[in-house]
């Protein structure tokens, strides 16, 4: 091993992430960089090349971080090794951004020249500043007629405090400005400085399961080197393995003889169980281990919970295995077994938001062929019991009876909404309607305002984002963070079918809205549950008090068609027999509840509740 050669190679490494608000063109810039450096041929090139998950291409968004090694021949005659990590822009996937940044020395801060700095631009920049990264401002979409690069530079300087006078102006669509951007990366992103002679220390920043190779770990080598045949130890679990392959993504896997300090690549080591590693763990040498592990990641708690059940109860174990494999690739997903009287055996899953929940459901259906029933999402409540203890409630059906607790607390968030001046009124009206408390309002410039509200998380996770977009014609952007729990007047509403509570349909609501929500729910269930051969009573109840009711009339068979004589006694006898049969059927008949009904709570927007 020629240390001088390796040190020279290390000096030419540049590790950087691309961060931005959703739809500001991160993936398009990544495409142009790959194209300009001849990393992919013209024949292989396609839009969103690094978004290799089918779901990402369907939705047109980045969901997973993705790394790629690029060789760039610079104007100084040297060849540089770029490790580029593309990141998501949606607030639900900010944990992917923080993991990407931990593997880098620099970050390209991409801002849309037509929209300027948005909520997630700020949030992601602060993550990069916390990691002490070199930040390069990049103004994208300068080819558009409405582009205003000077406005963007002023905003970056005023709102973020970065010098943007020499921000690179580019067009991800046409490739304009990309050569200048590559030169700026060489000049401004520092090379990694890890000690090549130190014991191996590597951070696992992502992982996935391969049916043939087992667990494939995405790693950033902080110190030392690693090659096939080396014995490694996962510091968190103490498990030891022998490395079978190391390499980089370019963008398809390319085997290498070794990875050195500063490299971002992958390794395999016959790790067969998904439980033996986790994202954020440190890998070291089993023979000469390092003393201290790397800091890893702050575990982000779920914000939204939902029940997940296989339509066929025989597939419970398949669902468990699929969730374990998915969790390897999605560190923020949490799940634990739960049982429902209505749906059988399943899992209570924790997500970072509704988009995250949708993505997990779609990935399970597309990648693992699962047929699922999902219950309506809920937040994590705290019930303060009479004895002073706190009970965590992530399933509304688990909330105890009213006499058993003193109060229920719900999570509150600080919501920051960036909005054009013209739409401040509708935004404030929407926030007030969602039980928001006004905090402050900052005028960012003569066109835009940052409105800050304290709001219950439960009001945000349903349809707040959709309503915000529709009331501002798509111009508003939202960022929020949990600030704590507050006692609120909340009640549990049970939905009963023929006097039997359906646990999966229970939900928690503010007392003032409880009756309207229960009425809306019964009306929806009446529409969604098909008619049966017997009458179905739908009721909403708080404890023993019925607060809403609807009835689904049964099918009625004409049992008198055989009577030709018009005998009234015979007719009455047949109808009475039919009535008795239906009554017996109602007592023993099981009402089949379709999947749509379990998601009905989601569809209860304010207009429905107010009966408009």
From Swiss-Prot:
Cellular location(s): Cell membrane
Gene Ontology molecular function terms on file: GTP binding; GTPase activity; ribosome binding; translation elongation factor activity
PROSITE patterns tied to this protein: G_TR_2
Domain tr-type G: 11-193
Record: residues binding GTP: 23-28, 140-143
Disulfide bridge partners, by residue number: none
UniProt keyword Nucleotide-binding, yes or no: yes
Known catalytic reactions: GTP + H2O = GDP + phosphate + H(+)
Enzyme Commission designation: 3.6.5.n1
Topology term for the membrane: Peripheral membrane protein
Alphabetically ordered keywords of this record: Cell membrane, GTP-binding, Hydrolase, Membrane, Nucleotide-binding, Protein biosynthesis
GO BP of this protein: positive regulation of translation
GO cellular component, one term: plasma membrane
Superkingdom in the source lineage: Bacteria
InterPro entries hit by this protein: EF-4, EFG_III/V, EFG_V-like, EFTu-like_2, LepA_C_sf, LepA_CTD, LepA_IV, P-loop_NTPase
SMART domains in UniProt: EFG_C (SM00838)
Biological role stated in the UniProt entry: Required for accurate and efficient protein synthesis under certain stress conditions. May act as a fidelity factor of the translation reaction, by catalyzing a one-codon backward translocation of tRNAs on improperly translocated ribosomes. Back-translocation proceeds from a post-translocation (POST) complex to a pre-translocation (PRE) complex, thus giving elongation factor G a second chance to translocate the tRNAs correctly. Binds to ribosomes in a GTP-dependent manner.
Family: Belongs to the TRAFAC class translation factor GTPase superfamily. Classic translation factor GTPase family. LepA subfamily.
NCBIfam families reported in the protein's UniProt record: lepA, small_GTP
Name of the protein in its database record: Elongation factor 4
Natural source organism: Lactobacillus johnsonii (strain CNCM I-12250 / La1 / NCC 533)
């Amino acid at each position: 091993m020629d240390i001088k050669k390796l040190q020279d190679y290390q000096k030419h490494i540049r590790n950087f992430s691309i961060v931005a608000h959703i739809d500001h063109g991160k993936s398009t810039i990544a495409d142009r960089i790959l194209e300009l450096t001849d990393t992919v041929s013209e024949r292989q090139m396609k839009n969103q090349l690094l978004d290799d998950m089918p779901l990402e291409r369907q939705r047109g968004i980045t969901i997973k971080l993705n790394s790629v090694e690029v060789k760039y021949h610079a104007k100084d005659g040297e060849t540089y090794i770029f490790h580029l990590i593309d990141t998501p822009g949606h607030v639900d996937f900010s944990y992917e951004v923080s993991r990407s940044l931990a593997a880098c020395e620099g970050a390209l801060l991409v801002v849309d020249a037509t929209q300027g700095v948005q909520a997630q631009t700020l949030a992601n920049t602060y993550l990069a500043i916390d990691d002490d990264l070199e930040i390069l401002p990049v103004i994208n979409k300068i080819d558009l007629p409405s582009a205003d690069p000077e406005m963007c530079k002023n905003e970056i300087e005023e709102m973020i405090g970065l010098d943007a006078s020499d921000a690179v102006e580019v067009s991800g669509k046409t490739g304009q400005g990309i050569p200048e951007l590559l030169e700026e990366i060489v000049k401004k992103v520092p090379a990694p400085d890890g000690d090549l002679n130190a014991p191996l220390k590597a951070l696992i920043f992502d992982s996935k399961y391969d049916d043939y190779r087992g667990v494939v770990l995405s790693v950033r080598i902080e110190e030392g080197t690693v090659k096939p045949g080396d014995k490694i130890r996962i510091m968190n679990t103490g498990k030891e393995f022998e490395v079978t392959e190391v390499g980089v993504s370019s963008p398809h896997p390319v085997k290498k003889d070794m990875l050195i300090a500063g490299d971002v690549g992958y390794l395999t080591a016959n790790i067969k169980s998904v439980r033996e590693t986790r994202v954020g763990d440190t890998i070291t040498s089993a023979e000469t281990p390092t003393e201290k592990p790397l800091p890893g990641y702050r575990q982000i708690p779920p914000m939204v919970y939902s029940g997940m059940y296989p339509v066929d109860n025989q597939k419970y174990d398949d669902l468990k295995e699929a969730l374990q494999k998915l969790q390897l690739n999605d560190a923020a997903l949490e799940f634990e077994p739960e049982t429902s009287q209505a749906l059988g055996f399943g899992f209570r899953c924790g997500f970072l938001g509704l988009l995250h929940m949708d993505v997990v459901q779609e990935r399970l259906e597309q990648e693992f062929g699962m047929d699922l029933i999902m219950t309506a999402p809920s937040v994590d409540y705290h019930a303060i019991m009479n004895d002073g203890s706190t009970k965590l409630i992530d399933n509304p059906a688990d909330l105890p009876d009213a006499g058993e607790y003193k109060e229920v607390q719900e999570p509150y968030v600080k919501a920051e909404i960036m909005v054009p001046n013209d739409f401040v009124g509708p935004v404030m009206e929407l926030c007030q309607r969602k039980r928001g408390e006004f905090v402050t309002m900052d005028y960012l410039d003569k066109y835009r305002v940052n409105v800050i509200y304290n709001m219950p998380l439960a009001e945000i996770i349903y349809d707040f984002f959709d309503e915000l977009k529709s009331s501002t014609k798509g111009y508003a952007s939202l960022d929020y963070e949990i600030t704590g729990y507050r006692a609120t007047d909340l009640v549990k509403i049970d939905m009963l079918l023929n006097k039997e509570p359906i646990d999966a349909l229970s939900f928690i609501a503010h007392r003032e809205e409880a009756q309207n929500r229960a009425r809306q729910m019964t009306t929806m269930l009446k529409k969604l549950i098909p008619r049966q051969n017997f009458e179905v009573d739908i009721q909403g109840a708080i404890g023993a008090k019925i607060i809403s009711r609807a009835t689904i009339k049964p099918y009625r068979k004409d049992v008198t068609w055989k009577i030709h004589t018009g005998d009234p006694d015979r007719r009455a006898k047949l109808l009475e027999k039919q009535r008795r049969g239906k009554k017996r059927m109602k007592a023993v008949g099981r009402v089949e509840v379709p999947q749509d009904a379990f998601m009905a709570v989601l569809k209860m927007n304010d207009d429905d509740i107010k009966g408009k």
